[in-house]
Structure formats: structure tokens, C-alpha cells
A protein has these predicted regions:
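Conserved N-terminal phosphate-binding loop of PLP-dependent enzymes in the Aspartate aminotransferase
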Residues: 2-431
Length: 431
């Protein structure tokens, strides 16, 4: 935010926030007249109201009141190169001038597919769609077409999009089409697979829980589940929508097996809506229109603008770029802990590459459900305090870095985090 805003100290972080964001409040009121939450994504909603942005440039976002924020959310980790990254802007703009979509093939789609097949070890063929949720649906259709079965198994605290069944499965609730088991519990997963082996078309797992507090599985868990799937003809699907940014070949490159299918999204669209399903050629063949066992289609699937932007994004996410964003996140982790210690606060963190989550209690190593966090009230107030210091994290206490950021900027972020903690202390938000 502006310097004047940053030195503001009123009765609470909430009041500081409201005084600095009157334009966002006005847009919230206007939006509520025609939309349920003045937006289309619940993930960024927070009280008293979310910000309304005007533009993004590089590492920064600018709201309608003219306040500047360091973008530590990257549109849910998807903008790995920051906002309006020039190579992506150039690629998308050039394609826009030639057309946005048509009922025929396009060369950028094939070029992006070639890049992904060359880069990701488990992918021999790939299909594109328009979101991670669509990618899940497409993969499930492929698995059903291949196996003739209907149900799927996922992890409690897992996330594979916003379909009703996946939302329930993430909460550990069984339904007519889905089953779930605790993430990392090999015995529980194998028991469900054995009990329902004749019903299961697919098992979906993340190599790291993107919405579950960045929890990593215990050694051998993924392989044991994969081997059980192989024994019973069940399609094993690895969800790398979030984790592709963590290594040149995604986290799948560190596994000692290759999943049957892989879900992709976020960074492969260069900031445009995108999803993808890749995997073994024999599995993807079930959507061949000459002998279809499952349907793959969509009005904007594989559109040339998204594909051109995605190719630029993937091309510029080199091993060196990934090392850079990982180092910046490590710098933030150390800095956040140091600032918390200076304030006499115990801060716990989880960092996987360029993804960092922070907690005001010891979360252990297992999955985290945001709704059950004992520090949720503090996190909500800290979020507003960070916004008032010109920092834009995810409301659920997570941040990420982008390739356009620098070490010097991370120093500023750490300083802003320290000032946000001071705000909480001054107004009784954290003892």
C-alpha cells in the first residue's frame, strides 16, 4: 500500500483495512446486487470484504484505491512468472490478433503438447481442457471408459476441483460415486481398494496436498497405492495441478514409478483458464473419435490463445527459474520465523519448494483442514494486517514466489510481515 496507509494505526487491523480500501468496499456493495459474493471464487473471500484489483504488473497488484501489494498468492499459485509477464503477453497478444478460437485444430496446442511430453516422464499423450476441475472430470471419464467401472477413491483433505463428489471426498464423506481414506494411511487406502476393487475406476492422489497444508506423504505410500491399483486394473491418477511448478518434471520425476494419468493446470495456461490430462498412450486412446469409449471435448478446450500463453510459461520455467523461486521462498521462511521470534511468537512453517504455509501452532506433518485450524481467528486478523502492509497472501496463511521477484523484494516482504505482527500485538490480536 502507500506509505501513508502503512503508518496508519487505528483501533484495529479491520478499521485500518476499511479506511484504506473504500473503493473495494464500493465495488463489493455493487457486486452484491448482482452476484452472491461479488465474485466467482470463494477461496479469496474474507471479511469484511475482499479487495477489488485494477491491474497486475510483475510482482505487484494494484487495487481500485491505488494501493500496491506484493503478490504472494500468484492467482492460487498459477502465475509462476508474476503478472503480465512480457513473454506471455507477447505470445498471447500475437495469437489474439490471429483469432481466439475456432472449430479446428491449432498449432500452439500441438507445440504445448510436445513440450509437456518431452518434459514430464509419465506423459506420452496429453489432452487439454479449461480448468483443474475439468481435468479431473476428463481423467475420470477416461478411467471409466477404460475399466467399465464407475467409482473413484481420493484422499481426505485432498482437492481435485469443485465438483460435488470431490468436495465431499475431501471432507472424508462417502457418496454413490466416490470413496475416501486418510492421506498417507497406506493400510486404510489398501483396505478400501481391496473392498471395492470391482467398483473402482480410478484412484486420485496428490504428491503433496495443495489445499491440505502442503502435507507430504510418508515414504512408500504413493507406490503402495499404485501397486494395488495395478493388481486390480484401477487407473492411478497423480494430480500435479499445483505441484508441476516444484520441479522441471513435476514431483512425478522423483517417484520410482510412473502414474497412469497426470492432471495438469495452473502454470500450463500462462494465466489463462486451463487444464490438462496426460499419461500413457493406450489410456488416452479411449477418447479417439474413431473408436470412442469416452468423450473429450469443450468449446474452448485447447484454444490457441491459452496454448500460446501456456507454451511461453512452460518454456520460461527452467530448472534455474525453479531454483530461484525456491530460494526466495526459503528466504521468506527464515525471515518470517525471525520476525515472529522477535515478537515473542512461536511460528511454525511448512515449505515445499516455492510454496510456504505458516501456523501459530505445531501442525505436525499430516493434512490440515482450514476450517479446523485452532489459529484461524489469528490468521484472519493477520491476513488483514498483511494487506495493510502491502502484502497479498492467500487468506489461508500461505504464500508463494514468482520468477520476477528478487532477494531485495523478499527483504521488504519480511519487514512488512514484521509490521503486520506488530499490528496484531498492538491491537490484542496475538499475545
Amino acid at each position: 500500500m502507500t506509505e501513508d496507509t502503512r503508518i496508519m494505526r487505528n483501533t484495529s487491523p479491520e478499521q485500518d483495512y476499511q479506511l484504506a480500501t473504500e473503493g473495494s468496499a464500493a465495488w463489493e456493495k455493487r457486486g452484491r446486487a448482482v452476484m452472491p459474493i461479488a465474485g466467482s471464487r470463494a477461496i479469496f473471500f474474507h471479511l469484511p470484504y475482499p479487495l477489488t484489483m485494477d491491474r497486475g504488473e510483475g510482482a505487484f497488484l494494484y487495487d481500485v484505491d491505488g494501493n500496491r501489494y506484493v503478490d504472494l498468492a500468484a492467482n492460487m499459485f498459477s502465475l509462476v512468472h508474476g503478472n503480465a509477464f512480457p513473454p506471455i503477453v507477447a505470445a498471447a497478444s500475437a495469437q489474439l490478433a490471429r483469432g481466439t478460437a475456432w472449430p479446428a485444430n491449432n498449432s500452439p496446442q500441438i507445440e504445448l503438447a510436445e513440450a509437456l511430453v518431452a518434459r514430464l516422464p509419465a506423459i506420452e499423450r496429453v489432452l487439454f481442457c479449461n480448468s483443474g476441475t475439468e481435468a479431473f472430470s476428463l481423467a475420470l471419464n477416461i478411467a471409466r471408459g477404460r475399466t467399465g467401472r464407475y467409482r473413484f477413491l481420493m484422499a481426505e483433505a485432498g482437492y481435485h476441483g469443485t465438483m460435488w463428489d470431490t468436495a465431499l471426498g475431501g471432507k472424508g464423506k462417502e457418496g454413490p460415486t466416490h470413496l475416501s481414506a486418510p492421506y498417507g494411511d497406506t493400510e486404510a487406502f489398501l483396505a478400501v481398494i481391496e473392498r471395492h476393487r470391482h467398483e473402482l475406476a480410478a484412484v486420485f492422489l496428490e504428491p503433496m496436498l495443495g489445499s491440505g497444508g502442503f502435507a507430504l506423504p510418508p515414504a512408500g505410500f504413493l507406490r503402495a497405492v499404485y501397486e494395488a491399483c495395478q493388481r486390480h486394473g484401477i487407473v492411478f491418477v497423480l494430480d500435479e495441478v499445483v505441484t508441476f511448478r516444484l520441479a522441471p518434471g513435476g514431483l512425478q520425476a522423483s517417484l520410482d514409478f510412473q502414474p497412469d494419468l497426470v492432471l495438469l493446470g495452473k502454470i500450463i495456461g500462462g494465466g489463462f483458464p486451463v487444464g490438462g490430462v496426460g499419461g500413457k498412450a493406450e489410456l488416452l486412446a479411449v477418447v479417439d473419435p474413431q473408436a470412442p469409449r469416452a468423450l473429450a471435448s469443450g468449446t474452448f478446450s485447447g484454444n490457441p490463445v491459452t496454448m500460446a500463453a501456456g507454451l511461453a510459461s512452460v518454456t520460461h520455467l527452467t530448472a534455474a527459474a525453479i531454483a530461484h523461486i525456491d530460494a526466495l521462498a526459503a528466504q521468506l521462511e527464515a525471515g518470517f520465523k525471525a520476525e515472529a521470534a522477535r515478537h515473542g511468537i512461536a511460528l511454525f512453517t511448512r515449505r515445499v519448494g516455492s510454496l510456504l504455509a505458516y501456523f501459530f501452532y505445531d501442525p505436525g506433518t499430516g493434512p490440515i483442514a482450514m476450517g479446523s485450524r485452532p489459529d484461524s481467528e489469528v490468521i484472519q486478523r493477520l491476513h488483514l494486517a498483511m494487506l495493510s502492509e502491502g502484502l497479498f497472501p492467500l487468506p489461508r496463511a500461505a504464500v508463494t514466489t514468482s520468477t520476477v521477484m528478487t532477494e531485495a523484494l523478499m527483504v521488504e516482504v519480511v519487514q512488512g510481515f514484521g509490521r503486520a505482527l506488530t499490528r496484531l500485538r498492538d491491537f490484542g490480536g496475538r499475545d
